[in-house]
Structures are given as C-alpha cells and as structure tokens.
Amino acid sequence: DATSDSLTIGNLVALMTLFRFRMHGARAIVLLGEATALIGDPSFRDNEREECGRTAILHNVHNFEQQVRKVFGKQEEPSHLLIRGNAKTFDDMSYTMFMTEIGRHVCGNDMLRRESMKQRREKGLTFAELGYLVMQALDFNELWMFENCRVQIGGNDQWGNICSGIDLIRKRHQPEHPALGMTVPLLTRADGSKIGKSSGTPVWLSEERTSPWEFFNYWINLSDEEAIQHA
C-alpha cells in the first residue's frame, strides 16, 4: 500500500523473492495499493490507520514504481515485469456489484477469527477495515483473471489476506489449477519487534529518507543474531 513516499527494506525482501522467480523465467507482477491505501490494512494493529489522501498516494505510487524498476532493471519489458495499481479495479466497480459479485463469496466469520484481527476486534473493527480484507482478496482475483497470475507473494503478516484471495478465486471460478500463495519472513530486531513503516523505525530505500551512508551502516551494525535473522 502506498501509504508512504518510499519503500523500505521490509518491502525489499518480497521484491527480491519475486526477482528470483523472474530470473527463472516467470513474469513478475508488482501490485501497488492505491485504493487499499485509502483505508489501510488492519492486520495486527490495535488502532485504525491514519487516512492518506489521494494526491499523496499518487505521488507515493510514482516513487514506488521508480524504486521497483531499480530492483528489476529499468529495461524490463512489460511482458516480463508488470507494475500496476489497484485503483481502477475499484473505481470501475459499483458498490452493488462489489457486494453481490464479491461479498457473497467471502465468509465474514473466517476473517474475524483471524489472529491478525484480534487486536482490532477488541478495540472495534470498522466496516471500512473489514472491507479492506475483501479488497485484498479481490486484488488477487483480478490478477488471476486478467494477468494469468497464479502465485501471490507477501510478508507472513499477509497470510490471511492471501488465503482470502485464494478462497475467492476457488469459489468464483472453480479453477482446474488452484491459485497459490507464499509468504516471506518479516524483518525483525533481536527482540522480535518489527522493522517497518508501522513500527515507526523503517530503513527506507529512498536516498532522501535514508542516506547511502545510513543504509550501509544499518547493515554493518547489525548484531550477529540480527544478521542471521535477515539472511
């Protein structure tokens, strides 16, 4: 989700995993969360995310795309690397269509039972946050239908959202070959705390946010235990 103006080293873990698939001949698809950034992922949070405006999101998406192309190589053809946002999917869909075509295939009880929703359940989950989970599922469904995407990769805190997409595809399409998902570990400190935007302690991929010197020193100064966790 484009809720900041730069990706972080946490995003880099998933991107490098996708890059390895690309090296072995797979087509890589990077989905940038435009519409979903307006709401924010409630997973493993004890409070609702702050609202992010559309103008800021468009600026962030532009920055994200430039950073992704640095990882994959700026000369990658669209047939090998597709970078797209998810705003058009939802802008072109009426609320009635969203509820009848998508909502009827999603089990609310399953979403509410997730461990990732526990903190938000206790504080009060908004309808918008619940809808976010359905939007995540629809993202995978759209890529499966129109881009022949068969595997979704995300951080292991996204496992529930990935499974929702897999279930939606199965219920709507009954595919001969099921959609699949895989997760990568989150970057954490030695004490287990997450390194990322939501923790307030990110290491940015933007030179303006984290200078090359600071980026270099972050890796040099890792403890042995943290270096093993990052490997």
Model-identified regions with their sequence ranges:
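Catalytic adenosine-cofactor/nucleotide-binding cores of aminoacyl-tRNA synthetases and other
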Residues: 104-107, 185-231
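NTP-dependent nucleotidyl-transfer catalytic core
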Residues: 1-158, 162-166, 172-180, 193
